Amino acid sequence: MSQFIIRRSNDILSKYLPIKYEHVVFCHLSPFQLALYDLFLRSPAIARLLRGNGSQPLKAIGILKKLCNHPDLLSLPDDLEGSEELFPEGYKPGDRRHVAVELSGKLSVLTRFLASIRSTTDDKIVLISNYTQTLDLFERLCRLRRWGFFRLDGTMNINKRQKLVDRFNDPTAPEFIFLLSSKAGGCGLNVIGANRLVLFDPDWNPASDQQALARVWRDGQKKACFVYRFIATGSIEEKILQRQSDKQSLSS
């Protein structure tokens, strides 16, 4: 039987899986994020793009998306000219010794959420991001808070990935957080040891997000599942969410 694969879609399995709750969590940008966001939108680079003279629209989109996660994902002040005038007192770009949680609206919400899960439940949770830089932030946060975690991204050897997932799925494992790159593992990665999942940033392709959101809601799951999509309000992430909705309505 090991030579064969049983192909079953979620349409079939959903009849036998526990209930799944999906939530969209809208988070305000921090004052620092908002100031940087406004600075970039008013920059000469964006003005050139709006006039049709710019040659790097994808770079601009990338800056906005990273800024929605945390200012530390950018190379400041190089990525945003003049941003050093907006730095909060004591802020040091690129400081890897700690995580400035308060400088990101989404990370502030996530930190309080993880602390609540840890103290009030025995649930495990998967944290997914499109950026390994965001996973680096999560990892530093977990180490500082002494939260047990595993991490899987594209740099991990394929042979080691399933072993790591199996360790996390073991109910006796003390680690309650699984850090996952959205593109790692393909369609077959089942992290059923967790029944909660946070998608920290959206992808333009709704199929990619749906695949990521289904990691915990797979065959073998015994508990009710909760998935949370974090969206920075008033930002490019709302536009991405809107585009996803439009694409899904066209395909349905």
Model segments located where?
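Conserved Helicase C-terminal RecA-like lobe
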Residues: K15-Q33, L41, G52-I177, S181-G185
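SF2 helicase/translocase ATPase core recognition
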Residues: I6, L13-P44, K160, F176-S252
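Short amphipathic alpha-helical interaction/hinge segments
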Residues: S9-I12, R48-L49, C68, D72-S75, ...
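Short, flexible segments with low predicted structural confidence
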Residues: R7-S9, F113
